[in-house]
Amino acid sequence: SIRRQRQDVYKRQPDGFCAYMTSRQHGAYHAAYSEPTLDAPLSSYFISSSHNTYLEGGQWKGDSTVEGYVRALLRGARCVELDCWDGPSGQPQVTHGHTLTSRVPLDDVVAAIAQYAFVSSPYPLILSLEVHNDLAQQEVLASILRTQLGDMLVTAPLEDDVPGVLPSPERYGTASLSSAR
C-alpha cells in the first residue's frame, strides 16, 4: 500500500525517525501551537523541576551544595526543592534528612536562588519546601525567605485572584512562589 511505502521511506532515511516525527502527517509538532501563551492557570503547564537540587553525588552520602541550585536555575528549572532541617545555632540547613549527606546553610541557598532565579528564564520560580524544622527555626526560615527574596516572593494573593485557581505565569511574572509540606 502507499501508506506502507511511505513508512518504509522513513525507515530507510538516516534520520528517518526525526523525519517521521516532524512530518505534517505524523508529527508531534504542530505549527498552530508554536507560540506558547502564558495566560492559563500555572497548573496547565509542564514545569521544569529539580528534585534533590542540593545534592551532588549519591543521596545517601553525597555533598549538599549551593552549586546544585545555580546549575539547575541556569539550565531553566522553574521548581527547585529545599529540604530544610534544624541546624546548629538556630540556623536552618538544607540536607537530605536521616542520611550521611553534608549540610549547607539555608541562608546561602536562598542567596544563590535570589541571584540566579531569573537569569535564564523570566517565568515564575516555585520553591518546593520540605520543612522539618522546629517552630523557632521555621520562623528563621520565613525571615530568610522574606529578607533574601524581598519583592520576588509572593506573600499574599494577587489582586483579582480567583480562590482555588492558580493565576497564570503571565500574571506572576518574575516572582518566587513557595509550597511547603
Indicate where each model-derived feature is located.
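Single conserved hydrophobic/aromatic residue that forms the stacking wall/gate
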Residues: 1-10
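EF-hand and EF-hand-like Ca2+-sensor regions
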Residues: 11-45
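Chitinase-like catalytic core of GlcNAc-active glycosidases
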Residues: 36-164, 172-175, 179-180
